[in-house]
A protein has these predicted regions:
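Short amphipathic alpha-helices within nucleic acid-binding modules
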Residues: 21, 85-90
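A short, acidic/glycine-rich surface segment
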Residues: 31, 60-65, 100-101, 133
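Mid-chain, well-packed structural core segment of small domains
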Residues: 70, 77-85
Length: 133
């Protein structure tokens, strides 16, 4: 199984300020922006070859009682694979617990799934990019 780092995803109060910071400080490039991605503004920026997803807080999101800061900050990190369903089988065989089974609902119609790591950390398993690269 060939795993590779895919992206970092921030959830924040001010998407534009977060994107502006990366553009200004690191000379990152905004490669997409959606003012309403499932209820919140969302942007993808490119820093070198690394993608950073930045999303606003959705109206129905509230902090978790165990992790009150979970709604903001680092949401998850993504690991790219060629085939999400095959990777899911491989990971399940090793004891991975899935919080989201493979489904095609990621940005740009990508196949995604999520596994839960210790300390309530989410790891997204994502298929190849369909839209932006």
């Amino acid at each position: 199984m060939d795993f590779k780092f895919d992206h970092v995803h921030f959830v924040c109060r001010d998407v534009d300020a977060m994107v502006d910071f990366f553009e200004r400080i690191f000379d990152a490039k905004r490669i997409s922006y959606n003012p309403d991605f499932n209820g919140a503004a969302s942007a993808v920026i490119l820093l070198g070859s690394m993608r950073i997803f930045v999303r606003g807080i959705r109206a129905d999101e509230t902090p978790d009682a165990v992790a009150p800061d979970r709604v903001q900050g680092l949401d998850h990190f993504g690991i790219g694979v060629d085939d999400v369903e095959e990777a899911a089988k491989w990971l399940k065989a090793r004891g991975a617990v899935f919080s989201v089974e493979p489904v095609r609902r990621g940005m740009g119609g990508r196949m995604i799934s999520y596994i839960r790591a210790p300390e309530n950390i989410d790891i997204e398993i994502v298929g190849p990019y369909i839209g932006h690269k």
